[in-house]
């Protein structure tokens, strides 16, 4: 299928926060409760629509283990967007965000759009990180923020699409040189009369049970 633009994403965060589950829910619309630990990098892709233009998202899901951090770092280069994920029921995954963000800022292009995702909001009764804390961290570091649930699919679509919307706006504002593919953006072509796949510019929001 043709596309107007291709955006490359990377999903980062600690082991077990649900990175692979978020990707699977977005690309296949299904939840797999038992998922093998990601070894190295996994890959997914999906078409969405932004401003009536078909956009292809290529998404790299990275391993959270420290031993794979050097592999992960190589994927920062050439990514237009990142989903930085923590688990709202595990405080330590939130505490490690600063380290992940430092890594991303050091190895990625300066204009990469980063979406902070507090995953597993369906388990709000086991919450260890408040919504306000996530929101404050995002505000302090210039990130977009959303809580989501890979299990119920709440805000999963929105997290990926809203990130794409921010990247698209940067293209419109002239922030990116789209002829330089190191920014994680590739200009495609569109067959007349063809629109994109599922998805559209969606409104963000909190996570409701």
From Swiss-Prot:
Residues anchoring lipid (S-geranylgeranyl cysteine): 207-208
GO biological process, one term: protein transport
Residues the record lists as binding GTP: 13-21, 61-65, 119-122, 149-151
InterPro entries, A to Z: P-loop_NTPase, Rab_GTPases_membrane_traffic, Small_GTP-bd, Small_GTPase
Pfam families per record: Ras
An example Gene Ontology molecular-function term: GTPase activity
Sequence motif Effector region, location on chain: 35-43
Subcellular localization: Endoplasmic reticulum membrane; Golgi apparatus membrane
UniProt entry keywords in alphabetical sequence: Endoplasmic reticulum, Golgi apparatus, GTP-binding, Lipoprotein, Membrane, Nucleotide-binding, Prenylation, Protein transport, Transport
SMART domains in the cross-refs: RAB (SM00175), RAN (SM00176), RAS (SM00173), RHO (SM00174)
Keyword Lipoprotein: yes
Gene Ontology, cellular component aspect: endoplasmic reticulum membrane; Golgi apparatus; Golgi membrane
Topology in membrane: Lipid-anchor
SUPFAM superfamilies: P-loop containing nucleoside triphosphate hydrolases
Known role: Protein transport. Probably involved in vesicular traffic.
Similarity comment text for this entry: Belongs to the small GTPase superfamily. Rab family.
Official protein name in the record: Ras-related protein Rab-2-A
Organism of derivation: Zea mays
Gene coding for it: RAB2A
